């Protein structure tokens, strides 16, 4: 797995380089302190991941990531920065992770393990666009200006709140900066169903289906004390999905 480091502080660059070599099998093929130099390098070289600071000369890390996102081969991007206010932008760019300085060594090592696993899955998957959700498929969620790499199967349901979407797992909740239609489009339709204009539910997390008023249903979920409604307009499709 080939990676580059983009960091204009020499000591920070050296520390990150040491951690990568010490705790992973990744090959560092370049270190840079200037955004434009990175773009020039990537025009002729392919890498699998980029560890990226934001406050760098010539072209800041966010703009650099926006340019890289247009490439046919999109490397994983891990932001490592002191600027916490760019976490939402990083999510929109589908960054793999967003780590704030100063960081704990354990935070870096945990990220490296997940990154190598994601890369291995990318290499071995012959059907990357398949609708079947594997146990280790993940999605990036935002919490407290941090990106949390979350297994898709951990999501129980999502609920619309105006232009935002609240996402719920068994123990956590997340606020996503997008409407529920956009968020649901990121989920595999074989496992998630838009049961109501305000709700999307993980079909695998349904514990009980109770008939409700006007031929609708209430869904009770495993492990959560919460009921998700099925609207009248979605009843027919829901019955077909659940073989009712």
From Swiss-Prot:
Response regulatory domain location is: 2-116
Q: Which Gene3D superfamilies match?
A: 2.20.25.10, 2.40.50.40, 3.40.50.2300
Record's subcellular location: Cytoplasm
The post-translation modification note in this UniProt entry reads: Phosphorylated by YpdA.
- Write out the transmembrane intervals: none
Q: Which GO terms describe its biological process?
A: cell motility; positive regulation of single-species biofilm formation; regulation of DNA-templated transcription; response to antibiotic
Q: Which domain of life is it from?
A: Bacteria
Residues that bear 4-aspartylphosphate: 53
Q: Keywords on this record?
A: Cytoplasm, DNA-binding, Phosphoprotein, Transcription, Transcription regulation, Two-component regulatory system
Any GO MF annotation of the entry: transcription cis-regulatory region binding
* Pfam annotation, one family: Response_reg
The terms describing its cellular component in GO are:
cytosol; protein-DNA complex
Domain (HTH LytTR-type) spans 139-244
InterPro entries reported in the protein's UniProt record: CheY-like_superfamily, LytR-like, LytTR_DNA-bd_dom, Sig_transdc_resp-reg_receiver
Q: What does this protein do?
A: Member of the two-component regulatory system YpdA/YpdB, which is part of a nutrient-sensing regulatory network composed of YpdA/YpdB, the high-affinity pyruvate signaling system BtsS/BtsR and their respective target proteins, YhjX and BtsT. YpdB regulates expression of yhjX by binding to its promoter region. Activation of the YpdA/YpdB signaling cascade also promotes BtsS/BtsR-mediated btsT expression.
The molecule here is called: Transcriptional regulatory protein YpdB
Provide the taxonomic classification.
Bacteria, Pseudomonadati, Pseudomonadota, Gammaproteobacteria, Enterobacterales
User: By which gene is this protein encoded?
Assistant: ypdB
